[in-house]
Amino acid sequence: MCIRDRECIEQLEEINVIPDIVLCCCGGGGLIAGISTAIKTKFDNAKIYSVEPEYFDDTKISLEKNKIVSNSMKHKSICDALLAEKPGNITFNINKINLTSGVSVSDDEALIAMNTAFKHFKIVLEPGGAVALAAAISEKVKIKNKNILVIASGGNVDKNIFKNCLKTETI
């Protein structure tokens, strides 16, 4: 956790950017716990948001209720890497300190973000890895005139899902 997250800070320092807002995908909460801990040590004023698939926003709801809440698991999502039933105990205790709140995005918003990443940056993202970008594109948080750090991770995407994303709109 420490090496990867320290690299994030070093890259921000290298380009001399102070993030106002950080958007990061969230399943069980491990990635965002590490990222948020690193960000908060250097950029204490940054607002950090977990981004989850619609109907699988257990971290968002858990943060709102200040206790771990489980998803019903009766819905489906293409964001298969993020379909945790509930936040991890250790990661939730870290995230409730570091995170501003959570947001959720639809599968369609994730597909648009995947297409946008591919068309504009030539990056192939899996649906779960595209949710943070989806949150920025769909303005789930106010980002105008802010420095936004979007954590886009994972390129393990089913070829049929990727073909579908290429048929969606893009920004």
Kindly label every feature range from the protein language model.
Residues 4-6, 88-145:
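Active-site-adjacent helical/loop segments in soluble small-molecule enzymes
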Residues 1:
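Nucleotide/phosphate-binding catalytic cleft detector across ATP-hydrolyzing
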Residues 4-97, 143-144, 148-171:
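Glycine-rich phosphate/pyrophosphate-binding loop at beta-loop-alpha junctions
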